Design a protein with these regions (language model features):
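Short, surface-exposed helix-loop/turn micro-motifs enriched in polar/charged residues
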Residues: 15-16, 55, 171, 186
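Catalytic-core signal marking the mid-to-C-terminal active-site face
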Residues: 63-218
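Glycine-rich anion/phosphate-binding loop at the beta-strand->alpha-helix junction
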Residues: 16-102
Length: 218
């Protein structure tokens, strides 16, 4: 085993003194990018929970708020976000510090290297918190369906795309005049708009089949 390790050793040709640590900087930068994606994920889930798109199972041993006992906070995702942010600040420092050394021989790297484990530990804690949080949430289909039903304007994109396919003149402007009036867009108004279009009846039938629940943007 020792022989195999020895064979894998390579000279670091750019330096004649301490190692240049470029490989460590690359690792830390990559981990920081991964953590940034997870921070964004945590914030998205937090937002979906606040919008009631996801519900959380209640743990009677957890305290949601010191003032409001009824609150069920997304504490696992908040915990994860905090740990990932802290880990990233250290990863950024390490990747910027370690490649720098006075004439490739100062010892500032020695104390810094002793703290490499810190951001990894916070990242592991964050990952565990994400897993814990995901196991506590469920999709609230009722709220999502209600939200979709109250937002018929989302089908305007699909209608415009089909009108372009049929070479309908200025479809964007037609939908803009419908949707940007300050008035609520509902199924009835969409239907009235479609009925007034100068297109084939088969196209009108196709357009009326589109609704917020079955249109996915494709």
């Amino acid at each position: 085993a020792a022989s195999d390790v020895y064979k894998r050793q390579k000279h670091s040709f750019p330096t004649t003194q301490i190692d240049h640590y470029d490989y460590l900087a690359a690792i830390f930068d990559n981990l920081k990018r991964i953590n940034t994606i997870l921070i964004d994920f945590n914030r998205d889930i937090w937002q979906y929970i606040s919008m009631d798109y996801f519900t959380q199972s209640v743990n009677k041993n957890e305290v949601g708020s010191s003032a409001m006992p009824h609150k069920v906070n997304p504490i696992d995702f908040e915990n994860s976000e905090g740990n990932l942010s802290f880990a990233n600040s250290i990863f950024e420092y390490l990747s910027g510090k370690l490649p720098i050394s006075r004439l490739q021989r100062d010892l500032t790297d020695s104390t810094v290297l002793r703290n490499i484990g810190v951001p990894f530990a916070h990242t592991v804690i964050a990952l565990n918190s994400i897993n814990k949080g995901l196991n506590k949430i469920e999709v609230n289909k009722k709220t999502i369906d209600e939200d979709l039903e109250n937002n018929w304007a989302v089908v305007a994109e699909a209608i415009q795309t089909i009108l372009r396919r049929e070479n309908y003149p200025k479809p964007y402007e037609a939908l803009k005049n419908l949707t940007r009036t300050g008035k609520k867009i509902n199924q009835e108004r969409i239907g009235e708009f479609i009925d007034k279009l100068d297109i084939k009846e088969s196209n009108k039938i196709e357009l009326k089949k589109i609704n917020p629940s079955n249109y996915t943007g494709i």
